[in-house]
Amino acid sequence: MARCLYNSTIREFLQLSPEALLGRFVNNYHGTALTVTNEAWANEIHIMQEVLQPWKDEDGQVIFEYDIPRLGKRIDVVLLLRGLIFCLEFKVGERDMLQSNIEQVLDYALDLKNFHLLSQNRIIVPILVPTRFRTSSSEFIPSVYDDSIYNPLVTGACLLYTSPSP
């Protein structure tokens, strides 16, 4: 059984239409995808295709809906880029930064670090994306645990687009 709904290089991801990608998500999903789930995936696909455009020539991977068996949850997006692991949790339509959502994305990063062999010696940057949030944290601060996990960043979707180019 696959541990994610979609996994490809950044280049391959950018070459597919949002409709084709959504079709793959639905086909790979084990269960009935509700309309709200499909809409969230469509939003995440659109956002990530915009965000990753400047990185199209990079040797990176993008993974959607990665299973975290210990929690019985899925990380919305795992991005492997330039030796870093970015763990993104989207809250589509949300305007606010909730502490419970920050804790959720940090838990995902901790689970990757502690229970995924290939992540153990990598730097992990958790990012919470309440899509309608109007501000952004941009200070990269290592956690107090000296475990190569950074404190979660929080940004609205529109501010992900304004990240510096490679």
What are these regions (language model features)?
Residues 1-134:
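Nucleic acid-processing catalytic cores of prokaryotic defense/repair systems
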Residues 161-166:
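Conserved small/polar residues in nucleotide/adenosyl-binding loops
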Residues 127-160:
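Short, low-complexity, polybasic intrinsically disordered segments
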